[in-house]
A protein has these predicted regions:
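C-terminal "cap" of GNAT-fold acetyltransferases
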Residues: 86-128
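Conserved acetyl-CoA-binding loop-helix of GNAT-fold acetyltransferases
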Residues: 29, 35-48, 75
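Conserved GNAT acetyl-CoA-binding A-motif
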Residues: 50-62
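Short acidic/glycine-enriched loop/turn segments that link adjacent beta-strands
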Residues: 18-20, 66, 87-92
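Polar/charged side chains located within well-ordered beta-strands of beta-rich proteins
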Residues: 10-13, 23-24, 43-46, 73, ...
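Acetyl-CoA-dependent GNAT
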Residues: 1-25, 30, 122-127
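Conserved active-site alpha-helix within GNAT-family acetyltransferase domains
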Residues: 40, 64-82
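A short, internal acetyl-CoA/4′-phosphopantetheine-binding micro-motif in the GNAT/acyltransferase core
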Residues: 26-34, 62-63
Length: 128
């Protein structure tokens, strides 16, 4: 299922044989909004959504050269589980995971709220 916000979008699907495991994909922030910390807000939104949907664990994949996404995942409490070379692209692909009810949810949601407050202040200042 696709979830869209003001700062980007992502998708969450249940793993077929393990319905308590979510696979997260298609996470993106539009190019014109990048570099403002909004991926952290979007990741926080994703965490809250995963928790509200009752998942126990989440996985995602990221290109091994995508340092920005790796930083977002690390800061959110995700851990790199494995990597492999894609037979389609020849690039390294990393598999990341996180316990939804564990460290990657509560602390990160709090951080996301702080980022949202900062974003709201910036928007108000821009309107003045």
């Amino acid at each position: 299922m696709r979830f869209a916000t003001r700062v980007g979008a992502y998708e969450i699907d249940s793993v077929h044989s393990q319905p308590q495991v979510a696979h997260c994909h298609a996470f993106f922030v539009p190019n014109d909004l990048r570099g403002q910390g909004l991926a952290h807000i979007l990741k926080s939104h994703q965490k809250a959504t995963l928790a509200s949907l009752g998942y126990d664990f989440a996985t995602c994949t990221v290109c091994g050269s995508n340092a920005a996404q790796q930083r977002v995942l690390t800061r959110a409490g995700w851990v790199r589980i494995a990597s492999f070379t894609s037979s389609k692209t020849g690039e390294e692909v990393e598999i990341w995971g996180c316990e939804v009810a564990g460290a990657c949810s509560t602390a990160y949601i709090t951080m996301g709220i702080q980022h949202e407050n900062l974003l709201d202040r910036r928007r108000k200042e821009a309107l003045l």
